[in-house]
Swiss-Prot record:
Organism name: Francisella tularensis subsp. tularensis (strain SCHU S4 / Schu 4)
Lineage, top ranks: Bacteria, Pseudomonadati, Pseudomonadota, Gammaproteobacteria, Thiotrichales
Residues noted as binding sn-glycerol 3-phosphate in the record, renumbered to the chain: K108, G136, S138, K191, D244, S254, R255, N256
InterPro entries for this protein: 6-PGluconate_DH-like_C_sf (IPR008927), 6PGD_dom2 (IPR013328), G3P_DH_NAD-dep (IPR006168), G3P_DH_NAD-dep_C (IPR006109), G3P_DH_NAD-dep_N (IPR011128), NAD(P)-bd_dom_sf (IPR036291)
The protein, known as: Glycerol-3-phosphate dehydrogenase [NAD(P)+]
Binding site for NADPH: W13, K34, K108, A140, R255, V279, E281
Top EC class for this record: oxidoreductase
Keyword RNA-binding: no
Enzyme Commission no: 1.1.1.94
Function: Catalyzes the reduction of the glycolytic intermediate dihydroxyacetone phosphate (DHAP) to sn-glycerol 3-phosphate (G3P), the key precursor for phospholipid synthesis.
HAMAP family documented for this protein: NAD_Glyc3P_dehydrog
Keywords associated with the record: Cytoplasm, Lipid biosynthesis, Lipid metabolism, NAD, NADP, Nucleotide-binding, Oxidoreductase, Phospholipid biosynthesis, Phospholipid metabolism
Gene: gpsA
PROSITE patterns documented for this protein: NAD_G3PDH
Length: 332
């Protein structure tokens, strides 16, 4: 099943997925929204800016500049932009996408202006286009180096989810399917906020007891919000939520965790963002999750605490004291 795939978004994650598709035998073209980045990839046949461990692209992967003019060449479009650029990318696609083409999203987060799920944005703008989400515990560098990785493909259309599953899967990359596109998105987005929380705790040297508590109680918060939005309960103990949460909260390959770590060590937000020197999705997602939780009357103490640190200049030590002295209650 050889296909022609366009990848929009040439960060580490988009590039790693483009490599996976090329290793799988597909013809892949990748585009960066920065012209100079496209020129570098075309000239050097690599993406050393984001994936320096990959010396050269395989023969089936090449950069492309004017993708709109060449849209007819592709069977599927993979969107791997930051969440801030997702809506504009879908709007661009609306102007040129063909009826037989479909979309796969590898973006995690919520719409920055409306706090809507990204699938809702895609369905609103392109109501007749098939849409799937690829998500789960996966660092780009490890996937690019063909280390064993397992993820989830979520779509309302199970047959389309299975198509995407076949598109990507090989001996190094295993895709599972689900129709719970809401739960898969909520887990993948909110875990970025909690990774910041875990990083702050690590930076303040709170220890592994606190780390375990953050992951466990954080999972409970994700589940509460997800169920309110219409997700299935079982999704939250799967790869798209628990798996991704464990990975992102526990390893400094995560930009969100590193950002939190720097904050916990005393840096300001701007200093920490500069030190990470890449998109920190959880910083923006914290605002969306905070507003969604307030809108739906969902109690999320860890998310609210992180929001206060990020947007209200709250002192992390004061926040910890407040969290630990909240009214005692039953775990469930």
């Amino acid at each position: 099943m050889q296909k022609n795939i366009l990848v929009l978004g040439a960060g580490a994650w988009g590039t790693a997925l483009a490599l996976q598709l090329a290793y799988r035998g597909h013809n892949v073209r990748i585009n960066s929204w920065k012209a100079e980045h496209n020129e570098q990839m075309l000239k050097d046949n690599n993406n050393h800016k984001y994936l320096p461990s990959i010396e050269k692209f395989p023969s089936r992967l090449k950069a492309i500049q004017d993708w709109q003019a060449n849209i007819i060449e592709f069977d599927s479009i993979l969107v791997a932009t930051p969440s801030s650029g997702f809506k504009n990318t879908i709007l661009e696609l609306k102007e040129c996408i063909l009826p037989q083409q479909n979309i796969i999203s590898a973006t995690k987060g919520f719409c920055h202006d409306s706090y809507a799920l990204l699938s809702e944005i895609a369905e609103d703008i392109l109501p007749t286009t098939k849409f799937a989400l690829l998500t789960g515990p996966s660092f780009a560098k490890e996937l690019a180096n063909q280390l064993p990785t397992a993820v989830v493909v979520a779509s309302k259309d199970i047959n389309y989810a299975r198509y995407v599953q076949e598109l990507f899967s090989n001996e190094n990359f295993r895709c599972y399917t689900t129709t719970d596109i809401i739960g898969a998105q909520v887990g993948g987005a909110v875990k970025n906020v909690l990774a910041i929380t875990a990083g702050i705790a690590a930076g303040m040297e709170f220890g592994v007891n606190a780390h375990a508590a953050l992951i466990t109680r954080g999972l409970a918060e994700i589940k509460k919000l997800g169920l309110k939005l219409g997700a299935n309960s079982e999704t939250f103990i799967g790869l798209s939520c628990l798996g991704d949460l464990l990975l992102t909260c526990s390893d400094n390959q995560s930009r969100n965790r590193r950002f939190g770590l720097y904050l916990g060590q005393g840096m300001t937000i701007q200093q920490a963002l500069k030190e990470v020197n890449n998109v920190v999705e959880g910083y923006f997602t914290a605002k969306a999750v905070y507003n969604l939780a307030k809108k739906h009357n969902v109690e999320m103490p860890l998310v609210f605490a992180t929001y206060r640190i990020l947007y209200e200049a709250a002192d992390p030590r004061d926040i910890v004291k407040e969290l630990m002295t909240r009214q005692l209650k039953n775990e469930n």
